[in-house]
Amino acid sequence: MTTLADLRINYSRASLDEADVAPDPFAQFDRWFKEALAAKLPEPNTMTLATVGENGRPSARIVLIKGVDERGFVFFTNYESRKGRDLAAHPYAALLFYWIELERQVRIEGRIEKTSTDESDRYFASRPLGSRIGAWASEQSAVIDSRATLEAREKAVAERYGENPPRPPQWGGYRVVPDAIEFWQGRPSRLHDRLLYTRDAAAAPDWTISRLSP
């Protein structure tokens, strides 16, 4: 019988060398993300978001990246959810993209800022109607007594707003403004390639690339 200790694979698809990466981590992320899309990976925009609450306890969950540019990495959520409360208490976060089919990870750390009202409005308006209604119906992370309660709220919101629900005031975007981005490429014998981009401040233009021991 296979045990947990027996489960392992040997990584051998590719390598990651300093001479081959972009000097800017956003350009390198764009390169890898396009390769994930070309490989037709299921939902390559999924990432783990790690936060820390007011009590010092960490928590993590899967969310979807919805924007990347030189300012940072953007996702949207309910500001009153657990992650929203965590980020209000400690405005720093870590992100992790894991593309196992390509034997790659991207790890991102940085401070958090809310996106502008206009940016949140534009993205909310682009969502499917059901998702916009759901943003009103769900008091994310709050305890509810039954599924029926949630569905009743959904029906009430749909009847109230019809085809044009506005963005709820408690719903919007966050941007992770990174000061560290690590690119990880699996290699044989667990001697993986790890290249870390860092900068002294989140707004600094220049990045330093360091190789980390696996």
Swiss-Prot record:
Purpose of the protein: Catalyzes the oxidation of either pyridoxine 5'-phosphate (PNP) or pyridoxamine 5'-phosphate (PMP) into pyridoxal 5'-phosphate (PLP).
Pathway: Cofactor metabolism; pyridoxal 5'-phosphate salvage; pyridoxal 5'-phosphate from pyridoxamine 5'-phosphate: step 1/1; Cofactor metabolism; pyridoxal 5'-phosphate salvage; pyridoxal 5'-phosphate from pyridoxine 5'-phosphate: step 1/1
Chloroplast among keywords: no
Family: Belongs to the pyridoxamine 5'-phosphate oxidase family.
Signal peptide: none
Protein name (Swiss-Prot/TrEMBL): Pyridoxine/pyridoxamine 5'-phosphate oxidase
Enzyme nomenclature, EC number: 1.4.3.5
Enzyme class: oxidoreductase
Native organism: Burkholderia ambifaria (strain ATCC BAA-244 / DSM 16087 / CCUG 44356 / LMG 19182 / AMMD)
Entry binding sites for FMN: 61-66, 76-77, 82-83, 105, 140-141, 184, 194
Residues involved in substrate binding: R8, I9, N10, Y11, K66, Y123, R127, S131, R190, L191, H192
Keyword Flavoprotein applies: yes
Any one of the GO BP annotations: pyridoxine biosynthetic process
Source taxon at top rank: Bacteria
Cofactor list: FMN
Lineage, top ranks: Bacteria, Pseudomonadati, Pseudomonadota, Betaproteobacteria, Burkholderiales
Keywords: Flavoprotein, FMN, Oxidoreductase, Pyridoxine biosynthesis
GO MF, one annotated term: pyridoxamine phosphate oxidase activity
Quaternary structure (record): Homodimer.
Record text on cofactor binding: Binds 1 FMN per subunit.
InterPro entries noted in UniProt: Pyridox_Oxase, Pyridox_Oxase_CS, Pyridox_Oxase_N, Pyridoxamine_oxidase_dimer_C, Split_barrel_FMN-bd
